[in-house]
C-alpha cells in the first residue's frame, strides 16, 4: 500500500471513529434523558398515590384529634373510635412510607434537591406518626400533649396541601415545598437547618 493510500485509509478510520463516537454520545445522552423522564414520571406517580392515601390519613387523623381523650377510659365508644382511627392512620402512614421509599432522588435533573426534600419531609412525618404509635402501645393509653396535638394538626395540613397541589395536572414542586414548609417546621426541629443546607431557606 502506497503512503498516499495509507494516509487516506488512516483519515477514513479516524473519521469513522469520530462518527461512531458522536453517534454513541448522542445515544447515551438520549438514553440518559429518557431515564430521567422515566424516573421523574415514576416519582409523580408515587406522589399521586401518596396524595390519595394521605387524604384518607388526614381525614382519620382529624377525627382522632376531635375525640375527647379524657373520655377514653369511661366510654367504650370513644375508646373504639380512637383505636379505629389511629389504626388506620398508622396503616396509611406505613403505606405512604413504602411509596416514599420508591421515590428516586437520583437522575431527576435539576429537580433532585426538590425530590430529596419531599422524600425527607414525608419520612419525617411518618416518623412522627410511628413514634406516637409506639408511645400509645407503651403506655396502653391515648395520651397526647399540646405539642403533639400541634404536630398532628401539622400532619393534617401537610397531606391536605399535597392533595390540593396534586389536583393540578402540572405539579410545581417548589410551590409544594413552600406549602408544607410551615407545618414541617412544627414537626421537625431540624427542618430549617435542612432547608438552609440545600439552599431552600427563602
What label would you give each PLM region?
Residues 1-8:
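Short, Lys/Arg-rich N-terminal segment immediately upstream of the first membrane anchor
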Residues 8-28:
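Hydrophobic membrane-insertion alpha-helices, especially the h-region
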Amino acid at each position: 500500500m502506497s503512503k498516499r493510500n495509507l494516509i487516506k485509509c488512516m483519515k477514513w478510520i479516524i473519521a469513522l471513529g469520530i462518527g461512531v463516537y458522536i453517534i454513541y454520545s448522542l445515544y447515551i445522552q438520549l438514553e440518559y434523558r429518557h431515564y430521567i423522564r422515566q424516573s421523574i414520571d415514576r416519582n409523580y406517580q408515587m406522589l399521586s398515590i401518596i396524595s390519595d392515601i394521605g387524604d384518607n390519613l388526614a381525614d382519620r387523623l382529624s377525627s382522632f384529634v376531635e375525640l375527647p381523650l379524657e373520655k377514653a377510659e369511661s366510654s367504650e365508644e370513644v375508646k373504639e373510635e380512637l383505636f379505629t382511627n389511629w389504626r388506620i392512620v398508622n396503616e396509611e402512614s406505613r403505606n405512604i412510607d413504602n411509596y416514599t421509599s420508591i421515590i428516586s432522588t437520583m437522575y431527576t435533573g435539576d429537580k433532585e434537591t426538590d425530590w430529596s426534600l419531599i422524600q425527607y419531609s414525608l419520612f419525617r412525618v411518618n416518623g412522627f406518626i410511628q413514634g406516637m404509635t409506639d408511645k400509645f402501645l407503651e403506655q396502653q393509653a391515648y395520651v397526647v400533649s399540646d405539642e403533639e396535638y400541634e404536630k398532628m394538626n401539622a400532619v393534617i395540613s401537610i397531606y391536605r396541601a399535597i392533595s390540593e397541589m396534586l389536583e393540578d395536572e402540572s405539579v410545581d414542586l417548589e410551590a409544594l415545598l413552600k406549602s408544607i414548609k410551615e407545618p414541617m417546621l412544627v414537626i421537625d426541629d431540624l427542618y430549617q437547618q435542612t432547608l438552609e443546607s440545600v439552599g431552600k431557606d427563602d
